[in-house]
């Protein structure tokens, strides 16, 4: 998973995804490795981490973490989720790739505000 991370906004956002293919390769268990989102957030220069999980019924669930400099609940709320400044999340059904693209665009837009 850590080799599959991507950076946006000059490294201020780091995001990774766990797809259904990855779940199957790991034996079919759908769980987030303990502390992965927090570990991602702890990287130098990163203000926000996003961990995206593809869900079997189509769509995704995502967790957002912040060091407190950015209110990640704003991203989650726009996607129908919730949370607080440092930790929030959302669950969205539909086309995985389209939702992921929208989520990342929203994240970049909010980071620029």
What are these regions (language model features)?
Residues 1-79, 83-113:
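Hydrophobic helix-and-loop "lid/oligomerization" segment in the mid-to-C-terminal part
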């Amino acid at each position: 998973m850590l080799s599959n991370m991507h950076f946006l906004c000059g490294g201020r956002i780091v995001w990774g995804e766990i797809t259904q293919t990855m779940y199957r390769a790991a034996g079919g268990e759908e769980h987030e490795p303990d502390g992965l989102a927090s570990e991602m957030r702890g990287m130098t220069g990163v203000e926000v981490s996003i961990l995206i999980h593809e869900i079997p019924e189509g769509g995704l669930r995502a967790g957002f973490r912040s060091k407190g400099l950015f209110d990640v609940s704003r991203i989650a709320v726009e996607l129908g989720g919730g949370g607080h400044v440092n930790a929030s999340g959302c669950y969205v059904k539909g086309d995985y790739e389209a939702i992921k693209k929208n989520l990342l665009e929203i994240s970049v837009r909010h980071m620029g505000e």
